[in-house]
Regions:
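Conserved beta-strand scaffold positions in the cores of enzyme catalytic domains, especially
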Residues: 172, 217-219, 345-347
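Conserved SGNH/GDSL esterase-like catalytic core that processes O-acyl groups on lipids
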Residues: 77-80, 119, 142-146, 188-289, ...
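Alpha-helical cap/lid subdomain in secreted, periplasmic
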Residues: 107, 241-386
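N-terminal secretory signal peptides that target proteins for export/translocation
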Residues: 1-22
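A structural signal for isolated positions on well-ordered beta-strands in alpha/beta enzyme cores
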Residues: 135, 171, 218, 315-317
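N-terminal secretory targeting modules
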Residues: 8, 13, 31-32, 39-201, ...
Length: 400
């Protein structure tokens, strides 16, 4: 039996053959040429894809952007997620993703992990007939341009329901620690792809904090990047302030067009580990580490100012580990001295750092989340958003 262009996908209790088709529209090409000199035009028609069923209303979270085809969403940042609700016993997930690890959850319980699923349809069958919530989440960091989520579909006869909604929003800006790189690992010395394979962004301090407050979130975080200086001075002059402007981490010319619906009440910044982990290298623009520290503090204060312009009513949480806590404390002090009142400083202490390459492990992430949650709770009126609304379609302001 030939299975050209098809694959057996097992999700739930049923396996089916599918043909990878990302667009449902019928494609018809008309070729106006003569057959054997007769002058009769020939119509060439590509076979229509099978009926995909009913497209569900989707709640897209994380830094995901609408795709070229209605119903599609493109994503590249870790933690991006898509949610929908329906009444029935079956649902299909349309994807084109060759880089990500993704988790499929039904009613809050993980049903399937998809590692680099490629292009096609993941079919879920055999659910108990009734109302369900499906969630698809990117749980790792990947290094391609972007992937595409093509929607959730249910068969005819099932009932679409309104997508989940939330009223709270938190934005996290950071590095590999923020996205939870290798947090599942139980050892510091890792080999090959282990550091990526042992990652689950759902268990990062960012996702844990958002879950505690039942908040939507964006995780804008990249490994080896710093606020002003990347690990060992790599990829200069780009730094996390540069990448923050992007719709996808590795697409330099695609600026993130921020939707009016995204106006986080809390912004958590966790940048400094890569800035200070390794001493200055030849060719870097600072005379010594003292000069770099001063530049880091200046740049951090300016970055908060840029973010404040986007979210006038947001509450900022600045976090640090031992290696750069004094510098972030100085940022916090300067912001307060300038009249900034909606800001907190959180110093992470007592971390075991037992995951790959001394990254925080799952226990550390739980502790870090608890510290951030305590700071937010202590602020009192964080969720009472103030200030002017964000302009529809606004972009992230560039650094000077």
């Amino acid at each position: 039996m030939q299975h050209t262009g098809r694959r057996v996908v097992k999700v739930g209790v049923c396996a089916r053959l599918w043909t990878p088709v990302l667009h449902a529209a019928r494609i018809v090409a008309v070729a106006l040429f003569a057959v054997a000199g007769t002058g009769i035009p020939v119509v060439l028609a590509e076979e229509s894809p099978p009926d995909r069923g009913q497209l569900l209303d989707v709640h897209a979270g994380g830094r995901a952007v609408p795709g070229l085809t209605p119903g599609d969403w493109d994503y590249g940042w870790p933690g991006a997620y898509f949610e929908a609700r329906f009444s029935g016993s079956a649902v299909d997930i349309h994807l084109s993703d060759y880089q990500s690890a993704l988790a499929v959850l039904i009613d809050g319980q993980e049903m399937k992990r998809l590692d680099h699923p490629g292009a096609g349809v993941q079919e879920i069958r055999g659910l108990a007939d009734g109302e369900h919530t499906i969630r698809l989440i990117k749980i790792n960091e990947s290094y391609s341009d972007h992937a595409t989520f093509g929607g959730f579909y249910i068969p005819a006869g099932e009932t679409p329901l309104p997508a989940p909604t939330r009223t709270r929003q938190i934005e996290f800006i950071g590095d590999s620690e923020t996205l939870g790189l290798s947090n599942l690992s139980k050892r510091r010395q890792c080999e090959g792809s282990e550091i990526v394979d042992q990652t689950d962004t759902r268990l990062s301090f960012a996702a844990r904090t958002a879950a505690h407050f039942d908040a939507d979130y964006q995780i804008v975080a990249m490994s080896s990047r710093g606020l002003l200086r990347n690990y060992a001075g790599l990829n200069a002059p780009n730094n996390m302030q540069t990448y923050y402007e992007r719709a996808f981490p590795y697409v330099a010319d695609k600026v993130y067009q921020r939707p009016a619906s995204w106006a986080p009440s809390v912004v958590v910044i966790s940048l400094g580990t890569n800035d200070f982990s390794v001493g200055l290298q030849d060719g870097e623009p600072w005379a010594d580490m003292d000069a770099f520290r001063a530049a880091y503090i200046d740049s951090y204060v300016a970055f908060v100012g840029r973010l404040r312009a986007l979210d006038p009513g947001a509450y900022f949480v600045l976090t640090a580990k031992d290696g750069y806590a004094k510098e972030v404390q100085a940022v916090y002090d300067r912001l307060q001295a300038s009249g900034e009142t909606r800001v907190a400083f959180v110093h992470f202490t007592g971390l075991s750092l037992m995951a790959c390459n001394y990254h925080p492990d799952v226990g550390d992430h739980a502790s870090m989340a608890s510290a951030i949650i305590a700071a937010i709770d202590a602020a009192g009126s964080v969720w009472a958003s103030g200030g002017d609304p964000v302009v529809t379609g606004s972009t992230v302001p560039h650094a000077n």
